[in-house]
UniProtKB/Swiss-Prot annotation:
Keywords: Aspartyl protease, Digestion, Disulfide bond, Glycoprotein, Hydrolase, Protease, Zymogen. Residues 59-364 form the Peptidase A1 domain. It catalyses: Preferential cleavage: hydrophobic, preferably aromatic, residues in P1 and P1' positions. Cleaves 1-Phe-|-Val-2, 4-Gln-|-His-5, 13-Glu-|-Ala-14, 14-Ala-|-Leu-15, 15-Leu-|-Tyr-16, 16-Tyr-|-Leu-17, 23-Gly-|-Phe-24, 24-Phe-|-Phe-25 and 25-Phe-|-Tyr-26 bonds in the B chain of insulin. Gene3D superfamilies: 6.10.140.60, Acid Proteases. Its EC number is 3.4.23.1. InterPro entries: Aspartic_peptidase_A1 (IPR001461), Aspartic_peptidase_AS (IPR001969), Aspartic_peptidase_N (IPR012848), Pepsin_A (IPR034162), PEPTIDASE_A1 (IPR033121), Peptidase_aspartic_dom_sf (IPR021109). This is Pepsin A. GO terms for biological process: digestion; proteolysis. GO terms for molecular function: aspartic-type endopeptidase activity. Disulfide bonds join C90-C95, C251-C255, C290-C323. The lineage of its organism: Eukaryota, Metazoa, Chordata, Craniata, Vertebrata. The active site is at D77, D260.
């Protein structure tokens, strides 16, 4: 049983805010802090996710909750573990223009007295936990615990073109100890294999998907390179080094990287970011003339003995003729040392398999 969820690529939040003349003000009020997602969990009921890196494009798909079904657009996020959607209890402006779950309309809903709190780079979500049937593609997950938001402070969610988030990372980082959706799919024997795979299309193309329980052979014709996980928290792997052209620029003594579909850019430590933009000859804000793309060198990630190369066409984002690097600087170092986030800029170049049975990530080159 293999189940495909098509993903839509949303207009970037950066562009929507720019169109409304709100970008500068937004960035002042919400300084970008990607590190907040990956900081050690402060309390058992808190986990971090980078809502801000949904600044660029986001890929989202539809799920349904309840009986009869109520539909929601969610980001399938391999960098977090909770499922949550807005609820009718939410009076924040962000909830007013999104779909809201109404538990009184579902005959299968079971309430709890538990609360959930999730902090983001730009704000936080707090709410209550409940149980219901969650339909993902043709899979009905019974008794799935999920968050019903009561507050979504800040204007951030207001402009997002998705309603909630479905986390696909490990139970160990789930806020309030809530069992993640994929863990229930496995324990309820709803998938043929204990893995899922992700294809994210390039600019403007359709066809992105998450496939639960299988690998689509049409996307693995160039072979699959398997990388063992270094931790069962995020989908975390060890990188050997990073090169620009043939020059060794970062990750000198190996470093940790997280493969994160919920982060649109490629996030790296401050020192690495400074060295890379210097080597690329790009200004510190990452803006670049679109005419220069052809002159830029490849950036290569050496992982488990294999070179994974990003050409400039992959790491430079062109939005309506203005170009910027798809790299972001992590800012504060995490307790995990030098950490990288391989977001959508990286994932678009590979068909990625997230294998829970063997705790590995598989990467198959797409071009």
């Amino acid at each position: 049983s293999i189940h495909r969820v098509p993903l839509k690529k949303g207009k970037s939040l950066r562009k929507q805010l720019k169109d409304h003349g709100l970008l500068e003000d937004f960035l002042k009020k919400h300084p970008y802090n990607p590190a907040s997602k990956y900081h050690p969990v402060l309390t058992a009921t808190e986990s971090y996710e980078p809502m801000t890196n949904y600044m660029d494009a986001s890929y989202y798909g539809t799920i349904s909750i309840g009986t009869p079904q109520q539909d929601f657009s969610v980001i399938f996020d391999t960098g977090s573990s909770n499922l949550w959607v807005p609820s009718i209890y939410c009076k924040s402006s962000a909830c007013s223009n999104h779909k809201r779950f109404d538990p009184s309309k579902s005959s299968t809903y079971v309430s709890t007295n538990e609360t959930v709190y999730i902090a983001y780079g730009t704000g936080s979500m707090s709410g209550i936990l409940g149980y219901d049937t969650v339909a993902v593609s043709s899979i009905d997950v019974q008794n799935q615990i999920f968050g019903l938001s009561e507050t979504e402070p800040g204007s951030f969610f207001y402009y997002c073109n998705f309603d909630g988030i479905l986390g696909l990372a490990f139970p160990s980082i789930s806020s309030s100890g809530a069992t993640p959706v994929f863990d229930n799919m496995m324990s309820q024997h709803l998938v043929a294999q204990d893995l899922f795979s992700v294809y994210l299309s390039k600019d403007g193309e359709t066809g992105s998907f998450v496939l639960f329980g299988g690998i689509d052979p049409n996307y693995t014709t160039k072979g699959i390179y398997w990388v063992p996980l270094s931790a069962e928290t995020y989908w975390q792997i060890t990188m050997d080094r990073v090169t620009v052209g043939n020059k060794y620029v970062a990750c000198f003594f190996t470093c940790q990287a997280i493969v994160d579909t919920g982060t649109s850019l490629l996030v790296m430590p401050q020192g690495a970011y400074n060295r890379i933009i210097k080597d690329l000859g790009v200004s510190s804000d990452g803006e670049i003339s679109c005419d220069d793309i052809s002159k830029l060198p490849d950036v290569t990630f050496h992982i488990n003995g294999h070179a994974f190369t990003l050409p400039a066409s992959a790491y430079v984002l062109n939005e309506d003729g203005s170009c910027m690097l798809g790299f972001e600087n992590m800012g504060t170092p995490t307790e995990l040392g030098e950490q990288w986030i391989l977001g959508d800029v990286f994932i678009r170049e590979y068909y990625v398999i997230f294998d829970r049975a063997n705790n590995k990530v598989g990467l198959s080159p797409l071009s």
